[in-house]
Amino acid sequence: MNQYKNFIMQFEDIVGNNNVLIDEPMKKHTSFKVGGPADLLITPTTLEQVKDSIILCRNNSIPYYIIGNGSNLLVRDGGIRGVVIKFLKLGDIKVEGDRVIAQSGAPLTNICNEALKSNLGGLEFACGIPGSVGGAVTMNAGAYNGEISQVIESAKVIDKDGNVFLLNKEQLDLGYRMSAIQKYHYIVLEVTFKLHNSEYDTIKNRIMDLNRRRTEKQPLEYPSAGSTFKRPEGHFAAKLIEDTGLKGESIGGAQVSEKHSGFIINKGGATAGDILNLIEFVQNKVMEKFQVDLHTEVRIIGEENN
């Protein structure tokens, strides 16, 4: 039974009737296209609504989970007990001189396009990353020798008590797929990037080149969460997996991509259980062969099926 239905009216008072969904299948909200139902899923349209929703959850001991595009997320088949707060409608972007300021739910691609229109370079590496900016900052997302830490100036965040404050670049403590936001369980509300002036064609050509390389090397035609594993120190996850003979390995509808071994894909009809079992299988086989521990880059949440 959904024990949080008693709070529906209170969430509707905060975010509006049309922005509260009950027993919502999470496969609709993740790039893996898997995942059981969330008890409640709400989509605030203002930062104040985010704050009020978090305070309501805190005051009533309701578990809550923040998601953006769901592009680096695997939700287990039993779904999520509590409230999912989706930042989909918090996507405002503005340009002020050489700075781009974006709300947490803004897709990285949209931010890159706004920077391009203003002849601002530095974010080209991020243009093909499918996530939203909040998640990208939280994990210091990167690709093709670029990462968020190189271009971020500050982030406005909220803590579990509803306090809103600004963190500068140093305070964000960004490392390889990590940040102070993860460490202290902050939630990103808004991000400021400091970019540099460049030529429109130079930026555009760089974006097109990186997108071409992505299309050639990554299985973009299948649902996935991007790179499944973090890069182990001194190794490349995809090479370890390939050298273990696991390219194309399948469990149910989940497969180690034949195009790029670092990606586990939903080949069709996969469950979250299939994907999790394949992740564990890959980790065990790589450990047996190379004594290297592969850690997942994808965020895994939710309950197992009963």
UniProtKB/Swiss-Prot annotation:
Gene3D superfamilies in the cross-refs: 3.30.465.10, UDP-N-acetylenolpyruvoylglucosamine reductase, C-terminal domain, Uridine Diphospho-n-acetylenolpyruvylglucosamine Reductase, domain 2
Domain FAD-binding PCMH-type positions: 34-198
One cellular component term from this protein's GO annotations in UniProt: cytosol
Catalysis performed (reactions): UDP-N-acetyl-alpha-D-muramate + NADP(+) = UDP-N-acetyl-3-O-(1-carboxyvinyl)-alpha-D-glucosamine + NADPH + H(+)
Pathway membership: Cell wall biogenesis; peptidoglycan biosynthesis
EC class: oxidoreductase
Active site positions: 177, 227 (proton donor), 297
Classification via HAMAP family: MurB
Annotated family: Belongs to the MurB family.
Entry function: Cell wall formation.
Protein's name according to its UniProt entry: UDP-N-acetylenolpyruvoylglucosamine reductase
Organism: Clostridium botulinum (strain Langeland / NCTC 10281 / Type F)
Gene: murB
